[in-house]
Amino acid sequence: MSRVAKAPVSVPAGVEVKLDGQLLTVKGKNGELTRTIHNFVEVKQDNNELTFSPRNDGAEANAQAGTTRALVNAMVIGVTEGFTKKLQLVGVGYRAQVKGNVVNLSLGFSHPVEHTLPAGITAECPSQTEIVLKGADKQLIGQVAADIRAYRSPEPYKGKGVRYSDEVVRTKEAKKK
């Protein structure tokens, strides 16, 4: 069995877990998340713990058990604490504004870029060059952050572009004559 899958997922107070066949629903103060569990994985619920085990002895079943455990743990953390992802805009004139569920970006193009946020994700701008994304679904937050970063990813000479706040951009040296 996978080392990750051996550890049970503890369900804190205030979180409701419902298992209906292969459909797992986790409900908490930050919302509700649903995921279909792979057929190779068996989930057991005992009081405030979820345990994951592979249905057979294959390598793929072991891998799926560990992956499923990690995803469900992220769901539980998401509905209790939530996840945040911070982006920085580096460059002259690069700005961001949030209006409702739309992030308006000025990234040096001849036109402003508007990115509509999916349901369950909120954004705020503490300053004109920072975007903070919040939500319960870890995968969705990461995808939205990657989509925004893709509009203008950091270039290797000056480092201008949209980057994650913890990202280190390695810069190249300019060509010498």
UniProtKB/Swiss-Prot annotation:
InterPro entries: Ribosomal_uL6-like, Ribosomal_uL6-like_a/b-dom_sf, Ribosomal_uL6_a/b-dom, Ribosomal_uL6_bac-type, Ribosomal_uL6_CS. Keywords: Ribonucleoprotein, Ribosomal protein, RNA-binding, rRNA-binding. GO terms for molecular function: rRNA binding; structural constituent of ribosome. One of its GO terms (cellular component) is cytosolic large ribosomal subunit. This protein binds to the 23S rRNA, and is important in its secondary structure. It is located near the subunit interface in the base of the L7/L12 stalk, and near the tRNA binding site of the peptidyltransferase center. Belongs to the universal ribosomal protein uL6 family. This is Large ribosomal subunit protein uL6. The gene is rplF.
